[in-house]
Amino acid sequence: MRQAARTARYDPALGLEAYGLRAVDRPFPSHFHDHYVIGVVERGTRTLTCGRRRQVIGPGDVLLFNPGDSHACIQADGSLDYRGLNIPRSTMLALAEEVTGSRAMPGFSAAVVRDGELAGRLRALHWAVLGDKPELRREE
């Protein structure tokens, strides 16, 4: 049996926290965050409930939660390995303005996205933040 673990590191230059969960077997009861959460499931299958929608998530799935999105998940098969980014509203607002030119809070329309390229980019950013890589590499 694998040992459960959690790692986390805040990156002040990017204004976000990267964290990883390994070998998680416990359910996550319904909860929400005051910040944006973007994550990638690396291992295990879970049943995710977000709002009124229930779906099975597994390796490679990208999870997108807006601040205040109520969500819960329970184990379906195997323990969970997950990597995520916690992004404060202020950081997301600044990023949205930089990309769109508009100072408006963005919102995710779906809680789960199946996009291998996006998952790969998120993994690279996650590794760069946890590994304390040079700022230029993280900003890519």
State where each predicted segment sits.
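Amphipathic alpha-helical segments enriched in hydrophobic/aromatic residues interleaved with Lys/Arg
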Residues: 98-140
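N-terminal regulatory/effector-sensing and dimerization cores
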Residues: 2-105
